């Protein structure tokens, strides 16, 4: 069991007054941030040698940790905006778990254009694209905060609209197994490593873009012949339709490892 605190990490300085054409958003970088790691590690090793000269060994280790930002100059409470639709900010905030994934509740696809029309009467989805572009096979975003529209609000801790923490990309468990054997001066060894309980947001160009779509899993997309498809309908990657369906973190396309 351990705790490690890393101080004087690089973070933004105080905002520069808006004088002489310098924007308050243009902040210098200084050593003023702090990160705290807490975790544990378990390791077991067995080594033996037989009378015939054959030796062997096996080892196993597993560890878990959580890294939390305890000091960071972000008085506005701006959120990390990877694939959320928020502009600009790529910072952290105090209390943030490293690796956290913010996204939208969206578990289903629209099954019919009638469903699209009925839903758009109740929920405004114009943050993603105009109402006339929505069709069956598009991602169905949920109005999580109940205000009649889906958007990220002001993108802050105090007002993040329908954005919420949907997962974390940091592995909860990391483990390894090592094997070794030896006989008369010859030795062989093997090492296996892995992680468990980790999320991955399948948004942006990482998996669903252009020439990257060459796995058989990409064939499981929504169509009239495949209404139960996992992926949304096929669209041009240069359009708002693509961005709305594949450009945002959603619960539907949050993968678990």
Where do the model's predicted regions map?
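Outer/extracellular conduits and scaffolds centered on Gram-negative outer-membrane beta-barrels
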Residues: 1-257
């Amino acid at each position: 069991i351990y705790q490690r605190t890393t101080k004087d990490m690089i973070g933004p300085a105080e905002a520069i007054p808006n004088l002489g054409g310098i924007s308050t958003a243009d902040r210098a970088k200084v050593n003023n941030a702090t990160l705290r790691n807490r975790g544990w590690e378990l390791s077991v090793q067995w080594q033996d040698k037989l009378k015939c000269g054959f030796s062997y060994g096996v080892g196993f280790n597993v560890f878990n940790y959580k890294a939390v930002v305890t000091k960071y100059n972000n008085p506005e409470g701006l959120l990390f905006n990877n694939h959320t639709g928020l502009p600009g900010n790529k910072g952290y905030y105090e209390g943030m778990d490293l690796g956290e994934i913010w996204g939208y509740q969206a578990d289903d696809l629209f099954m019919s254009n009638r469903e699209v029309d009925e839903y758009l009467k109740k929920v405004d989805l114009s943050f993603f694209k105009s109402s006339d572009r929505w069709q069956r096979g598009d991602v169905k975003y949920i109005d999580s905060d109940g205000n009649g529209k889906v958007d990220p609000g002001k993108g802050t801790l105090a007002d993040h609209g329908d954005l919420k923490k949907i997962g974390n990309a940091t592995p909860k468990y990391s483990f390894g197994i090592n094997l070794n054997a030896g006989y008369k001066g010859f030795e062989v060894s093997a090492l296996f490593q892995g992680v468990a309980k980790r999320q991955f947001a399948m948004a942006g160009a990482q998996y669903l873009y252009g020439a990257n779509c060459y796995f058989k899993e990409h064939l499981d997309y929504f169509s009239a012949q495949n209404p139960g498809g996992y992926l949304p309908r096929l669209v041009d990657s240069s359009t708002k339709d693509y961005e709305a369906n594949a450009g945002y973190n959603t619960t539907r396309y949050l993968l678990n490892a």
